[in-house]
Amino acid sequence: MKIGILGGTFDPIHYGHLWFAEYARERFKLDKVFFIPNKIPPHRETPLATSKQRYEMVLLATLSNPCFEVLPIELEREGISYMVDTIRDLSSCFSFDELYLLLGNDAFRDFLKWKEPYKIIEKASIIVGSRGIEDYSSDLKNFIKNFENKIFFLDFPYYPISAKEIRERVKRGLSIKYLVPESVEDYIIKNGIYL
């Protein structure tokens, strides 16, 4: 089986995440995409929504796609959510499967600053939602060259929205329709998140 892994704070999950996951799934013929909300993200600000709220929003957003599955493994683990630990756990559970880590261009740009990036690439290939490698550091360009058989660039139609923009719109009382699935919008409103 070919499994995609999309980690993130998902604060909140939005159509950009879903579109990237679906586009990568189709393009690379992935059987499943696991959405993995972080508990304590090492490279981002602390999420505003609780772990439970973010998990439930991801569940709601992915419910209609049988190829999408939400795994709470980082939420259940103590401490900072390092992807190397998640990949290690998944590779032991899915030892005969191919793992593909899905990363946006911004996350990939900082990949060498992550905890044990070489352990990650040893166990999983990487699919980068990107337009090319022109703006990467020389270290990252060398890394790409050394692992060119495990790093793939996916030129996909970019969905120009951010979770930060969505949170700001909610706080200002503006619509988030067409930015998040309706079920997620309803959940945010019902629970008064981001106000």
Swiss-Prot record:
Pathway terms, separated by semicolons: Cofactor biosynthesis; NAD(+) biosynthesis; deamido-NAD(+) from nicotinate D-ribonucleotide: step 1/1
GO biological process: NAD biosynthetic process
Protein keywords: ATP-binding, NAD, Nucleotide-binding, Nucleotidyltransferase, Pyridine nucleotide biosynthesis, Transferase
Entry annotated with the keyword Electron transport: no
InterPro entries associated with the record: Cyt_trans-like (IPR004821), NadD/NMNAT (IPR005248), Rossmann-like_a/b/a_fold (IPR014729)
GO molecular function, one term: ATP binding
CDD domains from the UniProt entry: NMNAT
Entry annotated with the keyword ATP-binding: yes
SUPFAM superfamilies hit by this protein: Nucleotidylyl transferase
Catalytic activity reported: nicotinate beta-D-ribonucleotide + ATP + H(+) = deamido-NAD(+) + diphosphate
SS bond partners: none
Pfam families, per database record: CTP_transf_like (PF01467)
EC number: 2.7.7.18
HAMAP family attached to this UniProt entry: NaMN_adenylyltr (MF_00244)
Function as written in the Swiss-Prot or TrEMBL entry: Catalyzes the reversible adenylation of nicotinate mononucleotide (NaMN) to nicotinic acid adenine dinucleotide (NaAD).
Family indicated by similarity: Belongs to the NadD family.
Protein name: Probable nicotinate-nucleotide adenylyltransferase
Species the sequence originates in: Dictyoglomus thermophilum (strain ATCC 35947 / DSM 3960 / H-6-12)
